[in-house]
Amino acid sequence: MKGYYNFADIEKKWQDKWEKDGLYKTQEETDKDNYYVLEMFPYPSGNLHMGHVRVYSIGDVIARFKRMNGYNVLHPMGWDAFGLPAENAAIKHGNIHPQDWTWDNIKNMKKQMKSLGLSYDWDREVTTAKEDYYKWTQWFFVKMFKKGLAYKKKAAVNWCPGCETVLANEQVVNNACERCGTEVEEKELEQWFFKITNYAERLLEDHKLLQNWPEKVKIMQRNWIGRSEGMRIKFPVKGSSEEIEVFTTRPDTIFGATYMVLAPEHPLVEKLISGTEKEKEVRQFIDRVKKQKEMERTSPESEKEGLFTGAYAINPMTGEEIPIMIANYVLMGYGTGAIMAVPAHDQRDFDFARKYDLPIRVVIQPEEREEELKDTDLNEAYEGSGHLINSDKYNGLTVKEAFDVMAEDMEKEGIGKREVNYRLRDWLISRQRYWGTPIPIVYCEKCGTVPVPEEELPVVLPRDVEFSPTGESPLAKVDEFVNTTCPVCGGKARRETDTMDTFVDSSWYFLRYTDPKNDKLPFSKENAKKWFPVDQYIGGIEHAILHLLYARFFTKVIYDMDMIDSVEPFTNWLAQGMVLKDGAKMSKSKGNVVDPEDILDRFGADTARLFILFAAPPEKDLEWSDRGVEGAERFLNRVWRLVADNIKEIKNTDQASLDVNSFNKNEKDLYRNLHVTIKRVTEDIGERLNFNTAISAIMELTNATYQYLNGVEKVNYTLIKDIIEKMLLILAPFAPHMTEELWSELGNDESIHIQKWPGYEEKALKKDEVTIVVQVNGKVRDKLQVSADIDEDKLKEQVLELPRIQKYTEGKEIVKTIIIPKKLVNIVVK
């Protein structure tokens, strides 16, 4: 055996053997309990980065640990292969076809993953850009279309000029495309949507089922869904049969509503201005506002602009005529596209009222204020709580009381009704790009919008396409794709040429892994029942809203189709931190990228894995350190030498079992250290996911073993054999190659990774002796080594016999003796 860990030879040897033996292949029929661990699958960019190494190493430790603990583990991997990044990269890299570019990248990244020693069942690999996968993405679309959950409408959409496509609201960050950073524009286009708003309440309500999700993630989702309880109230338009409906969370302030505001796009505007002297001026204003971006219109810093329409509404509670304005800060896509403006108690309304000299009426009196609050007292809106004033019979009621009483009265009088509203908007899934799942819809002049029959799926993405972005869907230029026959009447028809948002592909992939070869269904209910929901999901916090919300939505839709038994996809979710270098996220522009391939070439996979798991708790950001990597390498070589230096004696040990009762003190201490370590590592991996402290415990055990070997005259090699074998078993999930090699060198034929995880003995955890701190009047005066099970009288006796204690107690009265078992004795004297 060599005196050091030669990773270059050893790691490849075992990777090949594991693959040949099918060591990590998931068993379908077994009497073991099933466990499903999954890391978010990657977009095939071409190369792994350190963030990938971290998340996959975390998942791999859990998978290996669960296998050794007797579970039948599903640990698959696949590729989120469609979407803009692949298409943009293909264009950038010399007009290579996106499919070729993607397939090459998958091949390279798969090789890199294998070189990390990750225990994936590659027989279950899925690729979202392959027909055998996107056939079923289309199948789900058709099912959702038939249920009214997929629909097309004209909408103001976020348009990215850089990517030449539409973005969902969630993909716009600070008015820029999250992918390329280009400033986003608004366009009106016919687009496909999924009706995620139908599931808003369930998405909120079912957060209670996610006990093992980070609370901050649930808060982010709650804020995004934005549930608000309020009232939908009707304001009649003076001199007309028309009514303006508003949604408000503050019906208690209706007596302070002194004007109405409509979004410039509101359909009623046309009726109000048509043929009036205001028509020209209002139309010019509308044209100007339409050029403003939604983000710009709603920003608190943006100037509030408006115009009087010339029409009036009637406040249904006061009978008062109030002017109807249009303004840039009210959007048609939110609420009803109209608001009742209460300037005394809403800052935007206040700013607007001051600017256009509109009336301000205070209707909420702060509790702590003695004098009645008047509009002339206000420099800004009062948005706090209090009781009602200037509100007729409701005066004196608190805000909360008034909400309920006024809501009841308005419902009785038919003025309004209670309603729950959501900030969440339907999910826009249309993309005007090539590299995505074709939307399985045809348009027939006679039959209208028709879904492609399920038996005709998949609608195959053609290869011969000019996919450079022009703003129009590239598929629209492919006549043989576009021109088809109507599945209903057989007449001429045209295919939909938009493709789906890549988030659709990743919203159900975790279910396909349960039955990846099924060509009759996306998966069978029987197979899904065995594995679903995912027991442990791992991925970045940046996916808290987009991917995780969409995956939860899809799961509920599929549950309603009676295909699965769970309404939530992921029982436990771990959001791993980023890998930083020099305090910043790694990026080429910052010049602080650490290439995993370089690290694997220099140090090997086990060292890379060990460092990245040891350097920080998994949920925290990790600072890359070359010295830390070298430290991980040194530790692995210490373990290697521990085996190499003692292997001859260990193999010659003929005693089959340990005689614990014959141990001397040094042997007892080392044996106890072993079992304390097993307990700690078991709990750190299995309960807390604290891999860094688990590795630290193994390091401490290694040090203790060396200290024993170097400090005794006669070594108990039966004990050393037991310690080394168990140490290798608990180190195996972290350093799979080296432990496999050492396990084999010790004469074991079966892989270490299918061995039983070692248990710890409760009896061995107990100390035979404990150190007692001895105090006199609360000050430490001595320490005493005693038997762990000594009784209190005997302990007192031994304490009082200590010369240093007698020095402080002699000639004094002992008032009392305080004993904290196995820790402390405090003698109180006077």
Swiss-Prot record:
GO terms for molecular function: aminoacyl-tRNA deacylase activity; ATP binding; leucine-tRNA ligase activity. Keywords: Aminoacyl-tRNA synthetase, ATP-binding, Cytoplasm, Ligase, Nucleotide-binding, Protein biosynthesis. CDD domains: Anticodon_Ia_Leu_BEm (cd07958), LeuRS_core (cd00812). A motif ('KMSKS' region) lies at residues 585-589. Pfam families: Anticodon_1, tRNA-synt_1, tRNA-synt_1_2, tRNA-synt_1g. It comes from the Bacteria. Belongs to the class-I aminoacyl-tRNA synthetase family. This is Leucine--tRNA ligase. It comes from Halothermothrix orenii (strain H 168 / OCM 544 / DSM 9562). The gene is leuS.
